[in-house]
Amino acid sequence: LRISKIIAFSHMQAKFYFNATLTIINKKFNGLFMKIDKVFLASDHAGFELKNELKEAIKGLGYEVVDLGTNDKNSVDYPDYAHLLASKLEPNCYGVLVCGTGIGISIAANRHENVRCALCHDEFTARLAREHNDANVIAFGARVIGAGVAISAAEAFLKTEFAGGRHERRVKKIELEAGK
């Protein structure tokens, strides 16, 4: 046996190339097979107008949108709409929640199993919510950000795939068992 060329890799180089290859395969796999079936939207009275603007923008991107309310500016309780959206969420579906600050509605949504709701304020946080945290619900504060920023953040959220890898290990650690 004659070896004409020997290529030596350090441990770190081999690890880098292996991880880079897995990332490319993962992105291709997700890009080919990951399909968003529906995007559920819900808000309280403070988020009603922004929710409607987001609904039209998301429809314009070609997604099927399900508006769970509220349907006017009359005062309602944000937990009711967070719980409603969380109860409808299923695999390959995402959610968009809006209240005055986004804080209360995101806290309420995160009380549900299999909901990872991220309160986002821009495209960067929305993209990383998906890429690093595999968030399936995004929350906005209508009194905190404008429609333009919310729309661009929602688009980034919906178009970004979960990176997996080291982030998958971390996401698995989020779920805690009661009493431990």
Model-identified regions with their sequence ranges:
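Short active-site oxyanion
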Residues: 38-39, 92-95, 114-116
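A short beta-strand-loop structural module common to alpha/beta enzyme folds
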Residues: 64-75
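Short, structured active-site "lid" loops
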Residues: 81-101
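Mid-chain, well-packed structural core segment of small domains
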Residues: 98, 104-139
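C-terminal binding/interaction regions
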Residues: 124-180
